[in-house]
């Protein structure tokens, strides 16, 4: 029981001494704020100007919303001023030279963000202020600001944006509060490095290139007094890897697909389908672009220009493809090829485009040697052994007589005896026998045609010798000749028809090859001219966030140590 009582007394004494551990600070707080009015500007004379120094320490660049044109930042708003009512002698208060007090208990300058975009113009988290015995007050509250930032999408996604944050007193004019930058000199209102980046966390989307600040003194038409403000500028350069991989490379690939349309054969029937598919793909990219950039009419973004250029190429390729297909399926029935078209697209352009048309294979007129199995040596005067009947019949019907050499070939091919054609011709003065039926037999023809002779020769001789047999045989022969002529003419017309169709197809192929080269050159040149006009591609300046940020330096040192340990 005694030990428990001792412990309770010890704890009570400990808390009692702890509560009175800093009586000087409590006494100082009571003395400073007992008669303090936080609503009155802390100056000895109402005409005196109170100098307020302000700075900005950037912690994070949270977001740059292109579509809504809002920049979200996490900053510390550093403010300093002198309050003559908050001075004391440290010797009178046990050597206490600084005091932390709630900011709600002292006078604060009403500094707000002019270009605010979400309704909170001032600091929302009221942290404590630090009071120095000289009367100096330091207040560094954190804040998350959403400020309006005019987005310039001309070179998107290879763009640089300059956003600003404008701070100033909302009610006090320049005669009451003299607003200055923490690093400002007496002879200049411009500060080269106006934002402190020591505690900045590197952004994965933006590089900070410049952070100047400028102090402005403006006169408005409503008032005679000047109003002071400080503008903090942030020049941001986009890291383009994300948009290059997800937008630029797919767009370039789709644009070059329009070139392959002309390499696709016209007979495949897929040329128009490929063009329409490319147009639909470009439409999807247009929708993605419209979701990213603000709906501005001031300028067309770089990626939008490239998509428009690609869409024009694809649309033109559709028109050209339709024309090429029209040429490919032309025929002699509907179109006649002009001489200049034949000369230009069949003779001249193929040589320039390195197109070689396969030559047509001519049919071999000579028979193969194995056909002439029964004929070894033809006499040089074989043409004189021509049947009289063939001469006369050919003269009557305009059919050329079969040369003797061909007769020997026919005999060899058909297994007909060669001596069937080797008989001497009948004399023209040979008397015609009567209409006796016995005379039409092969043996009755004066023995000139042997039984082993070909039937055609026997029939020809019989027709020549017999007037009765001549007329019906001539009529049948005439019908046969007319049929043969019709078939031959039909085959000839068909070959000519197919030849003209092949010429049109060849012209279409030449057009395809010509437009393939034209569109390939247009795609390469257009891509280079549009993409390479972005100034940031040639800007070799290094971002300053890596130079000033202690967090970034520490991170790089850790990465370097890790890589060295790995090696």
Swiss-Prot record:
NCBIfam families: LIC. It comes from the Eukaryota. One of its GO terms (molecular function) is transmitter-gated monoatomic ion channel activity involved in regulation of postsynaptic membrane potential. Glycans are attached at residues 45, 233. Gene3D superfamilies: Neurotransmitter-gated ion-channel ligand-binding domain (2.70.170.10), Neurotransmitter-gated ion-channel transmembrane domain (1.20.58.390). This is Acetylcholine receptor subunit alpha-like 1. CDD domains: LGIC_ECD_nAChR_proto_alpha-like, LGIC_TM_nAChR. Residues 1-21 form the signal peptide. Belongs to the ligand-gated ion channel (TC 1.A.9) family. Acetylcholine receptor (TC 1.A.9.1) subfamily. The chain crosses the membrane at residues 241-264, 272-290, 306-325, 514-532. CNS in embryos. It is found in: Postsynaptic cell membrane; Cell membrane. Residues 326-513 are cytoplasmic. GO terms for biological process: chemical synaptic transmission; monoatomic cation transmembrane transport; monoatomic ion transmembrane transport; regulation of membrane potential; response to insecticide; synaptic transmission, cholinergic. After binding acetylcholine, the AChR responds by an extensive change in conformation that affects all subunits and leads to opening of an ion-conducting channel across the plasma membrane. InterPro entries: Neur_chan_lig-bd, Neur_chan_lig-bd_sf, Neur_channel, Neuro-gated_channel_TM_sf, Neuro_actylchol_rec, Neurotrans-gated_channel_TM, Neurotransmitter_ion_chnl_CS, Nicotinic_acetylcholine_rcpt. It is a multi-pass membrane protein. Keywords: Cell membrane, Disulfide bond, Glycoprotein, Ion channel, Ion transport, Ligand-gated ion channel, Membrane, Postsynaptic cell membrane, Receptor, Signal, Synapse, Transmembrane, Transmembrane helix, Transport. SUPFAM superfamilies: Neurotransmitter-gated ion-channel transmembrane pore, Nicotinic receptor ligand binding domain-like. It comes from Drosophila melanogaster (Fruit fly). Pfam families: Neur_chan_LBD, Neur_chan_memb. Residues 22-240 are extracellular.
């Amino acid at each position: 029981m005694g030990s428990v009582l001792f412990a309770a007394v010890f704890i009570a004494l400990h808390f009692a001494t702890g509560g009175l551990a800093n009586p000087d600070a409590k006494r100082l707080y009571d003395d400073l704020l007992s008669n303090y009015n936080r609503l009155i500007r802390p100056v000895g004379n109402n005409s005196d100007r109170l100098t307020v120094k302000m700075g900005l320490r950037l912690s994070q660049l949270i977001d740059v919303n292109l579509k809504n044109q809002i920049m979200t930042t996490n900053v510390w708003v550093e403010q300093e001023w002198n309050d003559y009512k908050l001075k004391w002698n440290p010797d009178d208060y046990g050597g206490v030279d600084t005091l932390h007090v709630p900011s709600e208990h002292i006078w604060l300058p009403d500094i707000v963000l002019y270009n605010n975009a979400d309704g909170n113009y001032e600091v929302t988290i009221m942290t404590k202020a630090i009071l120095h015995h000289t009367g100096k007050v330091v207040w560094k509250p954190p804040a998350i600001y959403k400020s309006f930032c005019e987005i310039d999408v001309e070179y998107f996604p290879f763009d640089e944006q300059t956003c600003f944050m404008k701070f100033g007193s909302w009610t006090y004019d320049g005669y009451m509060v003299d607003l200055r930058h923490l690093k400002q000199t007496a002879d200049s209102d411009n500060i080269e490095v106006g934002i402190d980046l020591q505690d900045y966390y590197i952004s994965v989307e933006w590089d900070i290139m410049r952070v100047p600040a400028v102090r402005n003194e403006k006169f408005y038409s409503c008032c005679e007094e000047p109003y002071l403000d400080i503008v903090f500028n942030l020049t941001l350069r986009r890291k383009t890897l994300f948009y290059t991989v997800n937008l630029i490379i797919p767009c370039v690939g789709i644009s070059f697909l329009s070139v392959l349309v002309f390499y696709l054969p016209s007979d495949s029937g897929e040329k128009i389908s490929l063009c329409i598919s490319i147009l639909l793909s470009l439409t999807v990219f247009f929708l993605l672009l419209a979701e990213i950039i603000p709906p501005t009419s001031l300028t067309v973004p770089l990626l939008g220009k490239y998509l428009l250029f690609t869409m024009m190429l694809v649309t033109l390729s559709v028109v050209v493809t339709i024309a090429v297909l029209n040429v490919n399926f032309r025929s002699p029935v509907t179109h006649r090829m002009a001489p200049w078209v034949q000369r230009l697209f069949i003779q001249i352009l193929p040589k320039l485009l390195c197109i070689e048309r396969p030559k047509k294979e001519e049919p071999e007129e000579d028979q193969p040697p194995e056909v002439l199995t029964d004929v070894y040596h033809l006499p040089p005067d074989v043409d004189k052994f021509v049947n009289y009947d063939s001469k006369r019949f050919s003269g009557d019907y305009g059919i050329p007589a079969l040369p003797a050499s061909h007769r020997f070939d026919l005999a060899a091919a058909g297994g007909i005896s060669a001596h069937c054609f080797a008989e001497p011709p009948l004399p023209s003065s040979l008397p015609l026998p009567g209409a006796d039926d016995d005379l039409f037999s092969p043996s009755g023809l004066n023995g000139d045609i042997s039984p082993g002779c070909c039937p055609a020769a026997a029939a020809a001789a019989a027709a020549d010798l017999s007037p009765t047999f001549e007329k019906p045989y001539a009529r049948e022969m005439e019908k046969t000749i007319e049929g043969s002529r019709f078939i031959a003419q039909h085959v000839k017309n068909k070959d000519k028809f197919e030849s003209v169709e092949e010429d049109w197809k060849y012209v279409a192929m030449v057009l395809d090859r010509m437009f393939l080269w034209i569109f390939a050159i247009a795609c390469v040149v257009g891509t280079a001219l549009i993409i390479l006009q972005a100034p940031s591609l040639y800007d070799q300046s290094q971002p300053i966030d890596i130079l000033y940020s202690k967090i970034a330096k520490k991170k790089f040192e850790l990465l370097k140590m890790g890589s060295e340990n790995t090696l």
